Amino acid sequence: MSFFLTTPTAIDLGVNIDHVATLRNARGTAYPDPVRAALAAEDAGADAITLHLREDRRHIVDADVRTLRPRVKTRMNLECAVTPEMLDIACEIRPHDACLVPEKRSELTTEGGLDVVGHFDAVRAACKQLADAGVRVSLFIDPDEAQIRAAHETGAPVIELHTGRYADAHDAAEQQREFERIATGVDAGIALGLKVNAGHGLHYTNVQAIAALPGIAELNIGHAIVAHAVFVGWDNAVREMKAIMVAARVAALHGGR
């Protein structure tokens, strides 16, 4: 049995603070402070703090990562590309988790999962470099059987399944097909002994079905929480998301009762 398997009732929320930094950088100010947002999110029930240090530093910057690392009380999940610069930073900072993601400068946000099959040697080397530095590695991948198998073969103990196509589905039938791909991917990851997380594009009205899947350990959500906070406040936005996730998981385990 994998060390990472948890009880079916447990589901964690990783709050992504990237778009707090986006708001700050829109006017070149020192506020809102993403580090302050991270600490407040922890107080409101977040189980981890996720942040993506992109090569172009469009939102999170190096100082955010360095300032947050000694102050985080839960876990820091640093998303980064498979490049020498980013791997060196991750090995220096030593977050609790490093999630390797694909990255293109032209994209508004991450558009798909990391192609582990096509870049296997580079990804495997990155996993070893991070593991040697004491950092747990996660791979952000599409819910594809070949990618999941390749992720396992790299030695990474965690995968995060890309839920963007589910979130962006144009109709209910397409969304159901994407949900079934995710559910199958969760089962495949669990069967290989991997910890399975998920995220991308999830919000307050589409997260329920994903949170109900008992094999998922953690959901990473950011933009929706930042947007909802405009209306209800940051603390409430975090608490509401966590409550929705937990309620969906409990209802699924008890047959909707």
Swiss-Prot record:
The active site is at H52, E79, H200. It catalyses: 3-amino-2-oxopropyl phosphate + 1-deoxy-D-xylulose 5-phosphate = pyridoxine 5'-phosphate + phosphate + 2 H2O + H(+). Its EC number is 2.6.99.2. GO terms for cellular component: cytosol. One of its GO terms (molecular function) is pyridoxine 5'-phosphate synthase activity. 1-deoxy-D-xylulose 5-phosphate binds at D18, H19, R54, H59, T109. It comes from the Bacteria. Keywords: Cytoplasm, Pyridoxine biosynthesis, Transferase. It is found in: Cytoplasm. GO terms for biological process: pyridoxine biosynthetic process. Pathway: Cofactor biosynthesis; pyridoxine 5'-phosphate biosynthesis; pyridoxine 5'-phosphate from D-erythrose 4-phosphate: step 5/5. 3-amino-2-oxopropyl phosphate binds at N16, R27, G201, G222, H223. The record marks E160 as: Transition state stabilizer. InterPro entries: Aldolase_TIM (IPR013785), PyrdxlP_synth_PdxJ (IPR004569), Pyridoxine-5'_phos_synth (IPR036130). It is an enzyme of class 2 (transferase). Homooctamer; tetramer of dimers. Catalyzes the complicated ring closure reaction between the two acyclic compounds 1-deoxy-D-xylulose-5-phosphate (DXP) and 3-amino-2-oxopropyl phosphate (1-amino-acetone-3-phosphate or AAP) to form pyridoxine 5'-phosphate (PNP) and inorganic phosphate. HAMAP family: PdxJ. Belongs to the PNP synthase family. This is Pyridoxine 5'-phosphate synthase. It comes from Burkholderia mallei (strain ATCC 23344).
